[in-house]
Amino acid sequence: MEQLTLRERESIVRARLGLTSNHAAAYAARDVDVDVIAAYPITPQTPTVEKIAEFVANGEIRAEYIPVESEHSAMSALIGASAAGARTFTATSSQGLFYMYELLYIASGLRLPIVMAIASRAASAPICIHGDYQDVMSMRDTGWIMIIASSAQEVYDSIIMAYRIAEDQRVLLPIAVAFDGFLMSHTTEPVELYHEEYVRKFTPKNLDRLILDSSRPITMGAMAVPDWYYEIKYQVIHAMNNSIEVIGDIHREFNNSFGRSYGFVESYMLEDAEEVVVTYGGIWGDVKRGVRMARKDGIKAGALRIRLLRPFPARDIVMSLSNAKTVIVLDRAVSPGATVDGPLALEIATALKLEGIDARVISAIHGLGQRTVYARDVYEVLKSSHHDGIQESRVYLGVREYGSG
């Protein structure tokens, strides 16, 4: 694949700013020229919609901003707007996501290309405004394509790509782009913003889909009896499964257009790795550092980051982990009562088993409620695994057990 020259890259980049992931999401929504934004502020997502409201007020974007009274209303408004042909955007977190939950299925069932940013946050109770991925993991079965970013630049780029993916005729599904609450949503990082004309050339508005139009009346969202419900739902499943090819195509086109390469997964030192840490989100930098620390101790360690959660890129994951002896899955969410407690660990274990790969899978829960996890913690779990110090298939890193004071 031909790479952009330095001069070509410089001509594409409009500005280099220090941005939080919240603001990176807002700039992406501005640059793709969204038509309708409906949102209700909730920590730690609030700065995203505040910044978009500022863009609208300043005339930087010609869009309708709807300050609704709840997240349920926000998604309802976007469903109506998207059904009428508008390009739409919202953002939320935690209880806000749960409040719009019934609408998530409606958005995917109606095949509406809505894009939503999620600043991930712990689920109440107890009330906790800090970050983990319990909210994000709760929507895996709603029919939304799901991307988890690990940097503010990736948030910006992923939202731009999300519109191309969602609006593709082969897909027509809503997309959620998630990132760590506070650890990313409120942390300033360098971000390159692209000139609007390049972004809008990459994301042309595609109205080649059925919309509510009084000049061409259609019925949308009608009741489906058993004779047809199954087939309609199967179309959503079919679109989701086939979207992985579209996502790959758009990744390659984005690289050709902007000089940034993304995949379904990201690997680190996997060539000869026997002990592999699998994770997602903003902890990726600490995981890589922990792997380097383990390598200095002679442990053949590596790491894999899952960027695309839905559709689940099982083939890429299996290829990446085919030589691993132990796979430690770091989950910042929990599925109580499941076969293994980590939502991602359950998916990884299933993918490996179906392909006959006999690696040991350890579900390692970490950082619930944003409990801090350091690179040394990753190193310690790798060292313990290497020396057969982990006997259980599930571990909780850094938790004070009941009765321990």
For each of these PLM feature ranges, what is it?
Residues 130-174, 178-181, 358-371:
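Conserved thiamine diphosphate
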Residues 299-326, 333:
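Core nucleotide-handling region used for phosphoryl-transfer chemistry
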Residues 48-51, 77-79, 100-104, 125-131, ...:
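Short acidic, glycine/serine/threonine-rich loops at helix termini
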Residues 264-299, 312-319:
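Redox- and metal-dependent alpha/beta enzyme cores, enriched for Fe-S-associated oxidoreductases
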